[in-house]
């Protein structure tokens, strides 16, 4: 009499998922869910629905994915609710439903157990930008950049600069870009950063600096 789900089946499903065989993974996770010989322990229902949702996202079935993630949220013993909320935010954003996306990204951020808030802050900022809330988006990108779990703050700082430009604050945009330049980044991103910086200097009426920034953007830094 098992006190939890069929672990062999679960491991098979996980390895199918890792091998990008999402159809098989979906079928096997669903089997774990429907296996009556094993009563699910607290948290396992949420974990299975979370994995099923991930499979459905990979299989480009957003509506069913939303349904699965919503089922996962019902299992309050499941620890990774922050991740489920983040995934819901991503699915809603992919469907251009930015208001719902904002709600779920915020829920992920508010969850103290959620380990990677910078990801939810990035999702939140991008969704807020889409609905024209540049100031709130900027605050979200700033939080993403400052999150010490963020391995690469450059994208957040680049987006923060974009928000400042939308708010007609070019000098603040320049400060964001300059703080980003201390980090390693791909040449294409670095060139974009210099081009954005050039535009910000133009907006601030500093033409000499604008020219220098544009020259840096055009000079191939790949050696």
Residue ranges and their predicted role:
Residues 1-47:
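N-terminal leader/linker segments that initiate helical-solenoid repeat arrays
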Residues 178-182, 195, 199-223:
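TPR/TPR-like (Sel1-like) alpha-helical repeat modules
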Residues 44-47, 51, 87, 123, ...:
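Canonical tetratricopeptide repeat
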């Amino acid at each position: 009499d098992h006190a939890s789900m069929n672990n062999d089946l679960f491991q098979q499903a996980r390895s199918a998922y890792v091998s990008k065989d999402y159809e098989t993974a979906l079928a096997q996770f669903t089997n774990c869910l429907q296996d009556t010989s094993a009563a699910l322990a607290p948290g396992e229902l949420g974990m299975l629905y979370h994995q099923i949702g991930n499979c459905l996202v990979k299989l480009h079935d957003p509506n069913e994915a939303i349904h699965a993630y919503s089922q996962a949220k019902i299992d309050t013993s499941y620890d990774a609710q922050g991740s489920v909320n983040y995934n819901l935010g991503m699915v809603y954003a992919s469907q251009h439903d930015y208001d719902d996306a904002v709600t779920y990204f915020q829920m992920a951020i508010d969850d103290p157990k959620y380990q990677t808030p910078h990801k939810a802050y990035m999702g939140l900022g991008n969704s807020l930008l889409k609905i024209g809330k540049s100031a709130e988006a900027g605050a979200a990108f700033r939080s993403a950049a400052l999150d010490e779990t963020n391995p690469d703050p450059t994208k957040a700082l680049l987006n923060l600069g974009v928000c400042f430009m939308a708010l007609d604050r070019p000098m603040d945009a320049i400060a964001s870009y300059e703080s980003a330049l201390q980090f390693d980044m791909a040449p294409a991103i670095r060139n974009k950063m210099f081009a954005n910086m050039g535009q910000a200097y133009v907006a601030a009426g500093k033409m000499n600096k604008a020219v220098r920034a544009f020259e840096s953007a055009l000079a191939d830094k790949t050696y």
